[in-house]
Amino acid sequence: MSENKRIGIASFDSGRGNTMKIIFPKVEEDCLSKYYRFNPKSYKGSKYSKYLNKFYKDRESWNAICPKIEEGRSFESYLKIDGLNTQEEKDVFAINKLNNDFFGIAIHHSGNGGLNTMKKIQNDHINGDNQRADISYHFGVSLSGEVLEGRPIGIKGAHLTKYNTGIIGIVFLADFKHDWWDVDDDMSKEALQSIITLIKALKEQFPNIGTLGGHKEWKNNTDRTCPGEYGLDYIKALRKELKLKSPKETGNG
């Protein structure tokens, strides 16, 4: 059997003298090469970035497919890294640029729709009703404590309504809206420790970040229930622990 991942075609002999071709979703290889991706090992990474790197999972680890970039699906890059050859060159250029753009972090939960993996969320965001170019969040945090790469950090997120510029999106792969009629999740020690490490690592590389809020706390998004009242209690505690302000305090709520 031969594969051509660049065009998403697999061909094989059917056993009857005929060659059959199957078109399948294109698994990532170089389709993100011109977009900047978060690098825990960058020159700006210090204590927390290095620790994060021990349990950080890139997109390839969860078999992400290439973004579906077409008219009507936003995939807006904050910067261009074309012509930069080494990872160090990309880090130096991108981190300086993105530090001027990033000011906040929005935290979400995946909710009760069964979308409890990055792969399921990406599939829903690309092929579901919203027809997005890629998974909307920049990072996912599992209850087991994994931190998973989502949308490249150099690409504007699609996780808030009309308020994504300068805001990094993180989703807990859990349901923190505790309703009596369905099965919900409790925060785990592992997930809490991991999101603290992730946020501290982001602050190391992008020190202008000063605002942290749940989905429903951001301007244009106050009608949302995400990340649930239970999840919001933890976000308030995270703000206190990390010495960050709420969207309302910084004029963004």
Task: Show which residues each predicted segment covers.
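Active-site acidic/histidine clusters and adjacent loop/turn architecture
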Residues: D91-A94, L98-D129
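Glycan-recognition patch characteristic of GH18 chitinases/ENGases
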Residues: G114-D134, G140, R151, D186-Q193
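Short connector loops at helix/strand junctions that flank enzyme active sites
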Residues: R132-S136, S142, Y163-I167
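Short, surface-exposed glycine/acidic/tryptophan-bearing loops
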Residues: I155-G169
